[in-house]
């Protein structure tokens, strides 16, 4: 879940299992006490999007692509932010934040040296370990939805030289200056990934693709037999992308989507992030498409 959305209460049945091998991670001790982490680096990704690198704690960070942290802007509040990084030992970890409210505004304004609070990681992940090496992987991102997918893309791209399955990345954004991680696309392609980008609108003279991200999917050339798709973006986009992937031959069970609501506790206790039978901080954010499709008909709040 890329940036905050909004509210919702109660338990989720065991049948709501995480997709493609993902499993919830519950922090062992003091889950509601944030650790202080210093901002080491800040980069402006787009006019309203900032990536922050946070110093690692003793022993480094542990997480899986698709999970999220609860970040605290001290004196302002706390918000759920996806981890937009590839797991590694002892490195700073990056979070990509869109400026949409008081807490995210404070986080986006953070400069190197600022202390922020970190809780987690929480939630389900993209289940990369469960994807067969020979299967094609299709990643579809809309706008800031590429942030929760970036770690998965980086991991899959790094494995491309030795992985028989191919990697396809389709990215959509509203405007050219809102394309996330544009400076990394060539590196992913150099490792063997097929990367395509489209924008909804562009100024005169723009020589890139203009149109909906769904228009890219039939052109990618992936083998739907056994393929896995990872999808994150606005909910209306995910509805149409999921439908088109199924029409192109992907099995619905092999499509994973990342859903967001107003996550507050991160541990499935407060009920603010309830969506149907799911508590998205615990049973999500990554869920299987068949589970998500009925829930995606509910409007964003």
Which positions does each model-derived feature cover?
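Short, charged beta-turn/beta-strand-edge "cap" motif at the junction between a beta-strand
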Residues: 75-78, 120-125, 299
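Local cysteine-cluster metal-coordination motifs and their immediate loop/turn environment
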Residues: 148, 235-237, 259-285
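Iron-sulfur (Fe-S) cluster-binding segments and ferredoxin-like electron-carrier domains
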Residues: 242-243, 248, 256, 271-300
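Ferredoxin-reductase
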Residues: 2-9, 14-114, 173-175
């Amino acid at each position: 879940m890329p940036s905050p959305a909004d509210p919702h209460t109660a338990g989720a049945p065991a049948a709501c299992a995480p997709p493609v091998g993902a499993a919830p991670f519950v922090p062992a001790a003091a889950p509601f006490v944030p650790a202080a982490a210093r901002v080491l680096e800040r980069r402006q990704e787009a006019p309203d999007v900032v990536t922050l690198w946070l110093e690692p704690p003793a022993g480094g960070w542990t997480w899986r692509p698709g999970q999220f942290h609860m970040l605290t802007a001290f004196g302002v509040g706390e918000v759920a932010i996806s981890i937009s990084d590839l797991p590694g030992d002892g490195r700073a970890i990056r979070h990509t934040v869109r400026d949409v409210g008081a807490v995210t505004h404070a986080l986006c304004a953070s400069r190197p040296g600022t202390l922020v609070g970190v809780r987690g990681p929480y939630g389900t992940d993209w289940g990369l370990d469960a994807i067969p090496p020979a299967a094609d992987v299709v990643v579809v991102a809309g706008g800031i939805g590429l942030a929760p997918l970036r770690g998965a893309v980086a991991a899959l791209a790094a494995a491309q030289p030795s992985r028989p399955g191919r990697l396809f990345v389709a990215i959509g954004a509203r405007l050219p200056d809102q394309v996330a991680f544009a400076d990394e696309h060539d590196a992913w392609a150099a490792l063997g990934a097929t990367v395509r980008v489209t924008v909804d609108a562009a100024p005169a003279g723009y020589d890139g693709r203009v149109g909906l991200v769904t228009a890219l999917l039939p052109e990618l050339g992936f083998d739907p037999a056994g393929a896995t798709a990872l999808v994150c973006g606005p909910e209306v986009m995910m509805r149409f992308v999921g439908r088109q992937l199924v029409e192109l031959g992907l099995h619905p069970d092999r499509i994973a989507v990342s859903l967001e609501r107003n996550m507050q506790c991160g541990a499935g206790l407060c009920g603010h992030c309830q969506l149907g039978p799911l508590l998205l901080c615990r049973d999500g954010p990554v869920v299987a498409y068949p589970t998500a499709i009925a829930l995606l008909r509910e409007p964003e709040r």
